[in-house]
Amino acid sequence: MSDIALTVSMLSLVAVLGLWIGNWRIYGVGLGIGGVLFGGIIVGHFAQRYQLDLNSDMLHFIQEFGLILFVYSIGIQVGPGFFSSLRVSGLRLNAFAVLMVLISGLITAAIHKLFAVPLPIILGIFSGAVTNTPALGAGQQILTDLGSNPSQIDLMGMGYAMAYPFGICGILLVIWLIRLLFRINIDAEARDFDSRNGHSHELLQTMNIMVRNPNLSGLSIQEVPILNSDTIVCSRLKRGDFLMVPLPTTQIESGDLLHLVGQKQELENARLVIGEQVDTSLSTRGTELQVSRVVVTNERVLGKKIRDLNLKQRYDVVISRLNRAGVELVAGNNATLQFGDILNLVGRPQAIDAVAAIVGNAQQKLQQVQMLPVFIGIGLGVLLGSVPLFIPGFPAALKLGLAGGPLVVALILGRIGSIGKLYWFMPPSANLALRELGIVLFLAVVGLKSGGNFIDTLLNGEGVTWIGYGILITAIPLLTAALLARLMIKMNYLTLCGMLAGAMTDPPALAFANGLHATSGAAALSYATVYPLAMFLRIMSPQLLALLFWSV
């Protein structure tokens, strides 16, 4: 069997064994995707014992490409809501991430000085304890630049392997302990996130208001500023027994009933200006109007603003809501359409059919993946990650690397949505498949590489001591941040899990956190919010530690 065929076979074995281990449940908690790492350690141990020759270049490529696939798909998933989340809670989340990085760095420095642990080994333990492979590479590079002995630099990998397993398990354990300690109800936390954090757009409300302000009588909809804004949509107007879709030029009369859609505060402002709230139903039942949901799939309308389609004047149809990546937005005139947007239409059946034909509404297109944008995004991400950042006093340039670059690019492209005929929308099933494939490949290779000398170092060397150091570097920052976040500011549990995973730059922990609730995107959103800064700080930390203690 060729070395390539053998390598693929071993990776498949690792994936099967690891996923099986990940499905084991102890008190309802399992390793999930993190089980692949331990499957890799087991297979790696026996591979070395029986002297199986695996292709190292192929393993290196698979490890890096798997990580790229994972972080890219995460970025595309959370991109549409990332920047709004950053405005709402990004400062607070990133403050906790910085706190965790700072504490882990201080503990590492203390262990190095108090126990005289060689610098290459403690930097390897640090990288493994915070589950950051790019930090390992950055540490090895700066030690090389500083003239360290190559044999000592190789010890970094062993320290990394000793600390990495608990780095993976430690965050899962903390997530589990916080859940038990505070008696967390996952469904309640998901609902709380939807109502309070970033998804407040989802809870768009409606209000029926009767026109009582005499100053509005005779004015058209577009002449009333509160009704001609991007924060409120007037989707129906009832005059007597007649229900209609109001046009911008439709004149308002005293006694008219307006059905408005928007956020609560905006609706209250409209009520103060227009008149009084009434409980009268403005349902389309029994009328010639109907409400339908259509999806944007026509490439010709991508990037166009709602006002450019002129649907009210041409078809007497109004878009009352716009759902993008699970977040409901007010369909203001300046809202730009993206592939996969779901539009809530109100109008006559024939007119709605005509509008549906314009925007596409081709459900089968939602299951198709444009591969060209995927590889454009990955390529741009790798280029960004390779750009060196020179800082005075640093002998080596800092880089976002193959994990940070693709994530940042994916966040931006996910937010943009489309450029011309290229769209970065990815069906949830395809996104999940890429994400899971990527993390399985990454962990399988890390496990295989760590497994060879893992048992020997654990039993006959200083492995147990190194693991103890790693536990301190892993557990203390996690517990400190988790308890402070939950006790001081009552942080949502799912958001907390994503923040911890992001601050540890730990994809398996994110996969575990995502699995806590089937539909909530809270963990992924907070992960992506803190990940770019955390990744930068994690890469910079071993370089700072090396510079501080090299000549001391």
Swiss-Prot record:
Family as reported in the entry's similarity comment: Belongs to the AAE transporter (TC 2.A.81) family. YidE subfamily.
Protein name: Putative transport protein NT01EI_3867
Example of a GO MF term: monoatomic cation transmembrane transporter activity
Pfam families tied to this protein: Asp-Al_Ex (PF06826), TrkA_C (PF02080)
GO cellular component, one term: plasma membrane
A biological process from GO: potassium ion transport
Membrane topology field: Multi-pass membrane protein
Highest rank taxon of the organism: Bacteria
Compartmental location: Cell membrane
Annotated TM spans: 4-24, 26-46, 65-85, 90-112, 158-178, 371-391, 403-425, 439-459, 464-484, 493-513, 530-550
Keyword field contains Nuclease: no
Keywords for this protein: Cell membrane, Membrane, Repeat, Transmembrane, Transmembrane helix, Transport
RCK C-terminal domain location: 191-276, 279-361
